[in-house]
Amino acid sequence: MTVDEKKDSLISYRLAQAKEAIDDAAFLFENHRGLRSVVNRIYYAMFYAVLALLVTEPFQGSKHSGVIGYFNKRFVREGIFPPETGKYLNLAFEARQESDYKELFMKKNKS
């Protein structure tokens, strides 16, 4: 398999992950399974889509904040995506952090 074929395969995989996360979010929402899980799946749909895009870039990293930062710098600030896209990605990240780790944040604040 060539490098380009490997990249194409990884892009397809990441986009399939994004689609699955969207489908999961819709199912959870429609079946009243809890907003926390819906927020998580929506964020991950966005994150996987960004990871698919970054396969085409010289980006190395896996931390969510690094991925989002690179996306905003390279694609939003350069006008490839509108500012709202970066804003929504940041909001989804913050909402996912809060919903997934709220209990942890509350314990830290009590200390």
Where are the language model's segments positioned?
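Terminal alpha-helical segments
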Residues: M1-S111
